């Protein structure tokens, strides 16, 4: 394969990834909601926190949105990560309060608990209590591979486990 053609394909692939990365924002015309994880009734900060056997998952409106919409989730994926990959299989969570003691025998400082909620599992609740599905990002054509990042498919939080 000629070098120029290979370079063109790489540029096209990079552009496709960049274009789809903003799909969750562009689809709804508003910033996406935010996943928050609470341990001992306190929000886990971005730099991380020590492990806690119970955690609460919340989906909060983006601070840039002031229209009174709140959010719920039907299903979240929780994965214990080490380095760049999963250390344990992903666990599906269907309620806000989750028991994390199953991670005890595997976890160590420096690992991450990765929480992902797909757009298809988000519910927007308006100020008057009406529920509606969160807008779905545009799907790739059936014959094309899905190269979208997690950020284009939903919302996530990464909890760095400290000592």
Where are these regions (language model features)?
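Long, low-complexity, acidic Ser/Pro- and Gly-enriched intrinsically disordered regions
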Residues: 102-107, 117, 148-149
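Aromatic sugar-binding surface patches on proteins
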Residues: 93-101
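Short beta-strand elements
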Residues: 126-163
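Short, compositionally biased P/S/T/A/G/V-rich stretches that sit at domain boundaries
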Residues: 27-56
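Surface-exposed coil/turn segments at beta-strand junctions on protein surfaces, enriched
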Residues: 71, 106-109
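Bacterial Sec-dependent N-terminal signal peptides
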Residues: 1-31
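Extended low-complexity, serine/threonine- and proline-enriched intrinsically disordered segments
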Residues: 55-91
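Short, aromatic- and glycine-rich surface loops/edge beta-strands on solvent-exposed regions
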Residues: 109-124
């Amino acid at each position: 394969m000629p070098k120029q053609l290979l370079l063109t394909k790489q540029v096209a692939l990079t552009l496709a990834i960049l274009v789809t990365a903003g799909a969750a924002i562009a689809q709804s015309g508003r910033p996406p909601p935010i996943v928050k994880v609470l341990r001992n009734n306190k929000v886990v900060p971005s730099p991380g926190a020590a492990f806690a056997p119970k955690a609460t998952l919340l989906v909060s409106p983006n601070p840039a949105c002031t229209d009174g919409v709140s959010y719920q989730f039907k299903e979240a994926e929780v994965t214990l990560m080490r380095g760049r990959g999963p250390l344990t299989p992903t666990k599906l969570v269907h309620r806000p309060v989750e028991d994390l003691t199953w991670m005890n025998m595997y976890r160590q400082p420096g690992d991450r608990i990765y929480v992902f909620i797909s757009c298809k599992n988000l519910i927007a609740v308006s100020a008057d209590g009406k529920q509606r599905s969160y807008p779905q990002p545009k799907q790739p054509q059936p014959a094309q591979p899905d190269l979208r990042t997690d950020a284009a498919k939903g919302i996530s939080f990464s909890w760095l486990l400290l000592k």
